[in-house]
């Protein structure tokens, strides 16, 4: 049975711009993870997105596109996650590209499939932070304030704490979790071991596991039981 995103506990994030062989992809899709999020910071094209979608669709797992550019948007996903980078220094990453997208696709958009994410990028060395000019030197109370804004002002369904390749601060994740009631807390970044997954699982509604898939698929698979226990 496919779970709605509100019920996801564990998600794998697959990058269309990275190579993954068929056996590893099958292991990921059949693993018991709750969903697959397709997205990346660079090199994401319509071609490689479509290729990855077609390969994932051989399996019954729920599949969402995290939109990183307008060119790679294609029908066929269960959900379309749209990041609004709350700590970006550039308005285009907060609402500008969103305006362009709605201007172009508004009449044909299915709003039931669209999931807005308040995105807070925490790793200054990540591609995502550079791309979006994210202000990452934030005190915990800054991040908590962004979380409150995302839930109570913007009423987005998801607040995504993105550490993008480095392991974050479990205490901050706990603090954020304590102020969110309706908005779901997604945590992504640097989870490579069972122990790291276990540290974040009590606080994040959804734990996102990405990069380790491409280095050690068995380590990636081991995070599922750690999150769901």
Curated annotation (Swiss-Prot):
Return the Pfam families for the record.
PcrB
Q: What does this chain do?
A: Prenyltransferase that catalyzes in vivo the transfer of the heptaprenyl moiety of heptaprenyl pyrophosphate (HepPP; 35 carbon atoms) to the C3 hydroxyl of sn-glycerol-1-phosphate (G1P), producing heptaprenylglyceryl phosphate (HepGP). This reaction is an ether-bond-formation step in the biosynthesis of archaea-type G1P-based membrane lipids found in Bacillales.
Protein name per the record = Heptaprenylglyceryl phosphate synthase
Q: Which UniProt keywords apply?
A: Lipid biosynthesis, Lipid metabolism, Magnesium, Metal-binding, Phospholipid biosynthesis, Phospholipid metabolism, Transferase
Q: Which cofactor does it need?
A: Mg(2+)
What GO biological process terms are annotated to this protein in UniProt? Answer: glycerophospholipid biosynthetic process
Give me the residues that bind sn-glycerol 1-phosphate, please.
Answer: 13, 160-165, 190, 210-211
Top EC group: transferase
Q: What is its EC number?
A: 2.5.1.n9
């Amino acid at each position: 049975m496919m779970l709605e995103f509100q019920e996801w506990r564990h998600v794998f994030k697959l990058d269309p711009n990275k190579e993954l062989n068929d056996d590893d992809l099958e292991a990921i899709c059949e693993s018991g993870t709750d969903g697959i999020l397709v997205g990346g910071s660079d090199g994401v094209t319509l071609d490689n997105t479509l290729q990855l979608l077609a390969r994932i669709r051989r399996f019954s797992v729920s599949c969402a596109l995290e939109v990183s550019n307008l060119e790679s948007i294609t029908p066929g996903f269960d959900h379309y996650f749209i990041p609004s980078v709350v700590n970006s220094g550039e308005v285009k990453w907060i609402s500008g590209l969103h305006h362009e997208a709605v201007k172009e696709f508004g009449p044909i958009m299915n709003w039931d499939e669209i999931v807005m994410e308040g995105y807070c990028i925490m790793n200054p060395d990540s591609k995502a932070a550079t791309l979006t000019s994210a202000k990452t030197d934030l005190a915990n109370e800054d991040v908590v304030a962004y979380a409150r804004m995302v839930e109570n002002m913007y009423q987005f369904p998801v607040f995504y704490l993105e550490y993008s390749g480095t392991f974050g601060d479990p205490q901050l994740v706990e603090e954020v979790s304590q102020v969110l009631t309706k908005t779901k807390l997604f945590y992504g970044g640097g989870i490579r071991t069972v122990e790291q997954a276990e540290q974040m699982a009590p606080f994040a509604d959804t734990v996102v596991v990405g990069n380790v898939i491409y280095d050690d698929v068995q380590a990636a698979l081991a995070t599922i039981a750690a999150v769901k226990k």
